[in-house]
Amino acid sequence: GDVYKRQILFYVAPPLVFISGILFNQFGIFYFNIVMNHTVFVPIVNTKGDVMGKAIASEAINRKNDYINPVIRIAVASHGMLFLLPRPKCNVFEKDKIDLLMEGYLIYGETLEQGAHRILRQTLPTAPLDHLHFNFMYHFENEATNRLVYLFTLDLDDDSILCNKNFKGGKLWTFQQMEHNLGRNFFSSCLEYEFEHLEAIIYTREKYKES
């Protein structure tokens, strides 16, 4: 009986271990592929916007890196004013500072247009896409972030879609009101940088409407 058991172990067990190892390894590869398929990546770019590589979004977003990641910001304008609200408390970067309504990272594989449309649809699903315009790009770096910002504006004739309980603390600001609060650590760093550009863009647009 013992000899028979030893023969089974000698002849049967090794192939079983080998087959089990293959199956376990295949399962590991399968599981890894599932995880990677659900892992979101963001592009790594240079200051011109050329894609140089990619990084796992969760790692790139939660800390400052040596590499640059592209960020889309959308300024919502209505009747010559900007809609601003406090940044979410969960934000790693400048939480509670007054800022634009929309900001998000470009996802690896997206075009700039696709990324902007995704961010707009997530926040204002009924907003007209043809009122969304790209304005300019700039590199912004401080002790907390390293980003290439693509700034868009969304012009709304009807501001009723901004009456949303999710936009806590949000309101329309005149540029004069904003100017009185510049340099007081009240607005986000990016908004402080964008202020003069946005003022010129919105002023020109409003003048064009009047003519």
Q: Where are the model-predicted features located?
A:
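Intrinsically disordered, low-complexity segments enriched in serine/proline and basic residues
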Residues: 10-16
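Acidic, metal-coordinating catalytic segment for phosphate/diphosphate chemistry
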Residues: 34-73
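Active-site segment of metal-dependent pyrophosphate-handling enzymes
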Residues: 90, 111-113, 117, 121-160
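Conserved Nudix-box catalytic region and its N-terminal flanking loop in Nudix hydrolases
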Residues: 58-72, 77-118
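Short, small-residue-biased leader/transition segments that mark boundaries at the very start
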Residues: 1-7
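Charged phosphate-binding loop/patch that engages nucleotide di/tri-phosphates or the phosphate backbone
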Residues: 189-211
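Transmembrane-cytosolic junction motif
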Residues: 23-36
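NUDIX/MutT-family hydrolases
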Residues: 103, 151-153, 162-191
